UniProtKB/Swiss-Prot annotation:
Transmembrane segments: none annotated. Its EC number is 2.7.1.148. Belongs to the GHMP kinase family. IspE subfamily. It comes from Staphylococcus haemolyticus (strain JCSC1435). This is Putative 4-diphosphocytidyl-2-C-methyl-D-erythritol kinase. GO terms for molecular function: 4-(cytidine 5'-diphospho)-2-C-methyl-D-erythritol kinase activity; ATP binding. The keyword Metal-binding does not apply. The lineage of its organism: Bacteria, Bacillati, Bacillota, Bacilli, Bacillales. ATP binds at P93, V94, S95, A96, G97, L98, A99, G100, G101, S102, A103.
Length: 282
């Protein structure tokens, strides 16, 4: 049996530049990981089936599951003659903007690579993974990075300054497609990705917090005002910086001191069912 860990990601920045001819948006973003993980195990089957074993009411176990699709892609690409059972122990909240599904898919690709002794590089897996999800290339590596294009153009950065992270997911669902559809690409405001990168390179925690930015945030907030309330609550309770991750709805707050982070955690715990106190991994 093979084991893999799938950490959640957060966006430190997210900018949308223009809509491409293929229908996707050209993006530029900086992402990193936190120590909130799904855990996966992989075991060969003789019947060539893909079986996803997951005890979660809101997560499918068929082709709608990204881990299933990742396994299917690996089996078809590398002509595997055995199946696989994938067991997922899930802690990352679903439809949260934390790339939980993409992290599971990336872990599945790494796991099958090891299980079947395919000896494929992470670069090869990343190039393959973009076929089923824009966050999968980043999740293959699980390293702080600038991601451009659809997410497949990756440039690694050093780890960001250490910090506590409070993650809060409000009790609502959000459609990434609806958020991108509502985005005004003629809006002149763009995210300063370079400022955030400079803060990471120089280890400047204060500048990092000041440079957190997500072009999708005001769009999601206009659809769901609860997101803005959570962010404001975090900042009022002492977060050094706060931002919505991805297309939402999860908001995170950064703090250098554990006592500070616990205060933020307690402040938002009453209004959200899913609140986590974790650390930056990078």
């Amino acid at each position: 049996m093979i084991y893999e860990t799938a950490p959640a990601k957060i966006n430190l920045t997210l900018d949308t530049l223009f809509k491409r001819d293929d229908g996707y948006h050209e993006i530029a973003m900086i992402m990193t990981t936190v120590d909130l993980n799904d855990r996966l195990s992989f075991q060969k089957r003789k019947d060539k089936k893909i079986v996803v074993d997951i005890e979660h009411n809101y997560v499918p176990n068929d082709h709608k599951n990204l881990a299933y699709r990742a396994a299917q892609l690996m089996m078809e690409t590398y002509d595997l003659n055995e199946g696989v059972t994938i067991t997922i122990d899930k802690d990352i909240p679903v439809s949260a903007g934390l790339a939980g599904g993409s992290a599971d898919a990336a872990a599945t690709m790494r796991g099958i690579n090891r299980l079947f002794n395919l000896d494929k590089s992470l670069h090869e897996l990343s190039d393959l993974g973009i076929q089923i999800g824009t966050d999968i290339p980043f999740c293959i590596y699980n390293r702080t990075a600038v991601c451009k294009g659809r997410g497949e153009k990756i440039r690694f950065l050093k780890k960001p300054p250490s910090a506590w992270v409070v993650l809060a997911k409000p009790n609502l669902g959000i459609s990434s497609a609806d958020v991108f559809k509502a985005l005004d690409l003629d809006d002149a405001h763009h995210v300063d990705t370079e400022m955030c990168e400079k803060a990471i390179v120089e280890g400047d925690y204060k500048q990092l917090c000041e440079s957190l930015s997500n072009r999708l945030e005001p769009v999601s907030m206009s659809m769901h005002p609860e997101i803005k309330k959570i962010k404001n609550n975090m900042l009022q309770c002492g977060a050094d910086g706060a931002l919505m991750s991805g297309s939402g709805p999860t908001v995170y707050g950064l703090a250098q001191k554990e006592s500070q982070a616990k205060k933020i955690y307690n402040a938002v715990n009453g209004c959200c069912n899913e609140v986590y106190l974790v650390r930056l991994l990078g």
